[in-house]
């Protein structure tokens, strides 16, 4: 069922990308990916803002970071609260509302079930000596973003 939804989203994103982002992503077998329409839009907007024009793989990993935080006891348990928590995302709230879901963020949403989740909880631009880089476990780097847990 969920794979059919992903294929449908991919097809619709080519035909009519403007309307696809409002589709809810839900899979009863996988609560990790369940979200409301509002959360889906928020997840895409923050990924577009944080990725600064990077590809869908980078955006999908940013989205996974947010979804992992929602599941973690260290963070709030909703996508909205994770995104709006003070000082967590450099683009929120200042730049967040300047961005909208786009074709790349739609492709990123479609990739979520297929990308290896390394349980990342943090990401940052490649910076040596930052608080995150010295206090958290480095996992991987993609397009100049470092991911940690």
What kind of region is each of these model predictions?
Residues 1-22:
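Sec-dependent N-terminal signal peptides of Gram-positive bacterial secreted proteins and lipoproteins
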